[in-house]
C-alpha cells in the first residue's frame, strides 16, 4: 500500500494537524481509541495510507508530532483524539523558539531534529511502499517555519525520491501573532521553493474573511479558522484515502498540478462553506457546488484568481452525484471563463469524484488551483519584509543566533524571482512560444 508519513510542527501545525486527524478518523470510522466502528468497506480499503494497524486491530496514525515546547503537545494529548497517537511519536523540546526562525532552523531546532528524524525513520521503515511525507506547519512562527523547513531539507536528503507535501499557513496582518512574521515567512518560502513538491498555501487572512463575511461570525477564533482548514485538508486528501482513479497518490497529483518545478504553491478552496457544528439544510446541486468552488470568496488563500490565470486545477467532488453532470459543469466553467485558464496547457482541469461525503454534508467539492494570482500573497509578504529589512529592524534576534544578513537578502530575492516567474507565465500566450524557449534555456543554465 502507498503510505504517507504525516508530520506536524509547532503550535499551529499541531493544532491543525490534530484537527485533521479528528476529521479523517471520523470519516474512516475510527474512534479515539483507534478502534474501527465504520459501516463501509470503502473506509478500510486504503486505511493503510495514513494509519498503521497495531496489535488487537487498533489503527494508529502514522504521525510525528514535533514542537520546541511542551505546551501544545500536552493539549493535543488531552484533546478528543489525543490517545490515538503513538506516545513515542511526540518529540518536543523545552526551550521554545520564541517566534524566531533562526532558533527553529539553526539553534534550538537543530538540536532536536535528529531525534525527530529517528521517529520519522522508524515510521518510514514500517511502510510497505512509502509514497511521501506531509507536513502541517505555519510560516509565521519559529518552530513550524524554522524547524519545519529544517526537517523538510533533512528528509529530502535522506529520501530524495519521495514526494514532499506541505500544508503551510501563511501569515497575514489581520490575524497576526508577532511582528517578525514577514521575516519568518520569507525565510521559509526560500526553503519551500527548493525543497517541496507541493505546498498548499492556507492563508489566515482568507480564512478570517470567510468566517467574517460568509459564515457571519463576528469574532472568529482559531477554532473557527481550523475548522475550515481541516475541511479543506480532508478534501484534498480524499483521493489519497479512498479508492479512485484520479490523483490517487501524491506523485500523480504533482504530475498533474506542477508544470514548472518551482511553481508548486496551490490555492485550496472548499464548497459549501459551513461553520462549526452547523448542519446543512438542503443539498446543493452540482452547478451550485461548481460555481461556489471557483468563487474567489471560497479560496483559502487571500488572492483573487481573477487577477491571474490558472496553470492547472484539480477538483474533488464528494457524495452521490452524477459523474456526467460533474463533467458537464466543469467544462461549462472552463468554456465560460476560458481567459482565466492558460491556453498553452490543454486539459488543465482534472476532476475526481468520491462517493463518501464529509460528515454532516450530502455533497461537497474541494478545489486545488495552481494560479499565477498566488503571486499576490508572496508580494504582500515581500513588501512587509522589505519595509522592516530596509531599516534592519529586529535583525539582531536572528544574527544573534548566528545568521548572516546575506541569507535575508537571498531569501528576499528568491521570493521576488518567484513572483516574476508567476508573472511571466501569466503573460505568456501560445503564440509567442518561439522566443520564449530560448530565454528559458538560458535561465535553466543560470539556475
From Swiss-Prot:
It comes from the Eukaryota. GTP binds at residues 11, 69, 138, 142-144, 204, 226. Transmembrane segments: none annotated. Its cofactor is Mg(2+). Mg(2+) binds at residue 69. Residues 420-447 are annotated as: Disordered. One of its GO terms (molecular function) is GTP binding. InterPro entries: Beta-tubulin_BS, Beta_tubulin, Tub_FtsZ_C, Tubulin, Tubulin/FtsZ-like_C, Tubulin/FtsZ_2-layer-sand-dom, Tubulin/FtsZ_GTPase_sf, Tubulin_C. Keywords: Cytoplasm, Cytoskeleton, GTP-binding, Magnesium, Metal-binding, Microtubule, Nucleotide-binding. Disulfide bonds: none annotated. GO terms for biological process: microtubule-based process. It is found in: Cytoplasm, Cytoskeleton. Its main location: cytoplasm. One of its GO terms (cellular component) is microtubule. Residues 429-447 have a biased composition (Acidic residues). Belongs to the tubulin family. Dimer of alpha and beta chains. A typical microtubule is a hollow water-filled tube with an outer diameter of 25 nm and an inner diameter of 15 nM. Alpha-beta heterodimers associate head-to-tail to form protofilaments running lengthwise along the microtubule wall with the beta-tubulin subunit facing the microtubule plus end conferring a structural polarity. Microtubules usually have 13 protofilaments but different protofilament numbers can be found in some organisms and specialized cells. Tubulin is the major constituent of microtubules, a cylinder consisting of laterally associated linear protofilaments composed of alpha- and beta-tubulin heterodimers. Microtubules grow by the addition of GTP-tubulin dimers to the microtubule end, where a stabilizing cap forms. Below the cap, tubulin dimers are in GDP-bound state, owing to GTPase activity of alpha-tubulin. PANTHER family: TUBULIN. This is Tubulin beta chain. It comes from Paracentrotus lividus (Common sea urchin). The lineage of its organism: Eukaryota, Metazoa, Echinodermata, Eleutherozoa, Echinozoa.
